[in-house]
Amino acid sequence: MAESHLDPSKLATGPAGFGAAAGQRPLAPLNAKIEVKNLNFFYNQFHALKNINLSIPEGKVTAFIGPSGCGKSTLLRTFNKMYALYPEQRAEGEIVMDGENLLQSKLDISLLRARIGMVFQKPTPFPMSIYDNIAFGVKMFERLTRSEMDDRVEWALTKAALWNEVKDKLSQSGYGLSGGQQQRLCIARGIAIRPEVLLLDEPCSALDPISTGRIEELIAELKSDYTVVIVTHNMQQAARCSDYTAYMYLGELIEFGETEKIFIKPARKETEDYITGRFG
């Protein structure tokens, strides 16, 4: 793939304050849940993210799109510091939530990931019962009675549109569920601890079209309670599910704005070329 020769000063910003050119600090919208300021990320010496400035709106679904290797999953994983286990990986800049720079925060990693939950590309149920898959994380942060835990498990499975399918087999292994059910189980597990933000990294890539449709319907419902950020290679999915879309290329944020505007009338030719299939 050819090297990018983009002029950062001409990056499109979308709605006022939601994005900014590299090296500039954006004005934070009043309802920003996460503010990314001059973020750079490195895998050893490889510069994977370059001066990212972005504000994630609260109570909305934001999609990251772009070709493979553009940095969208890397950006997603900086929000809850998934890189912290790997000393050769490092982030510089600011990721601010509730006035606190999460990159410099002394906040316990487990507590951070309770506030910012994550669902991965492939379903990852724990090797335990459906019930215990949901209860496991809750027990780490709350002391609930059995009755309270029963209510929480039912609540999470209901929110994930799975309760009616599993309510009579809660003691059975999560491995016995279909792929789509397992992914909804993982979403239920993620929201059971009541996070503020839910990160979804290609949550439908391994699923059939019917299961994908159910997950997309679920995403639309979840934004009433959570700020949702999704990485997807499926541009149609981004168009269907998200309120805001960020297009990335070679570690740079090229364009960010309301999804309808990004897909119907993008401000950058690079974005248009990618969305229309002329590139990527």
Curated annotation (Swiss-Prot):
Principal location listed in the UniProt entry: membrane
UniProt domain ABC transporter: residue ranges: 34-275
EC number(s) recorded for this UniProt protein: 7.3.2.1
A GO MF term: ATP binding
CDD domains in alphabetical order: ABC_PstB_phosphate_transporter
Binding sites annotated in the UniProt record for ATP: G66, P67, S68, G69, C70, G71, K72, S73
Keyword vocabulary terms for this entry: ATP-binding, Cell inner membrane, Cell membrane, Membrane, Nucleotide-binding, Phosphate transport, Translocase, Transport
Reaction(s) catalysed by this chain's protein: phosphate(out) + ATP + H2O = ADP + 2 phosphate(in) + H(+)
SMART domains: AAA
Cellular component GO terms, alphabetical: plasma membrane
Membrane topology value: Peripheral membrane protein
Gene Ontology biological process terms in this record: phosphate ion transmembrane transport
Entries under SUPFAM superfamilies matching the protein: P-loop containing nucleoside triphosphate hydrolases
Record localization: Cell inner membrane
Enzyme class: translocase
Domain of life of the native organism: Bacteria
A Pfam family: ABC_tran
InterPro entries attached to this UniProt entry: AAA+_ATPase, ABC_transporter-like_ATP-bd, ABC_transporter-like_CS, P-loop_NTPase, PstB-like
Function: Part of the ABC transporter complex PstSACB involved in phosphate import. Responsible for energy coupling to the transport system.
Subunit relationships: The complex is composed of two ATP-binding proteins (PstB), two transmembrane proteins (PstC and PstA) and a solute-binding protein (PstS).
Family: Belongs to the ABC transporter superfamily. Phosphate importer (TC 3.A.1.7) family.
Cross-referenced PANTHER family: ABC TRANSPORTER I FAMILY MEMBER 17, PHOSPHATE IMPORT ATP-BINDING PROTEIN PSTB
Record protein name field: Phosphate import ATP-binding protein PstB
Gene: pstB
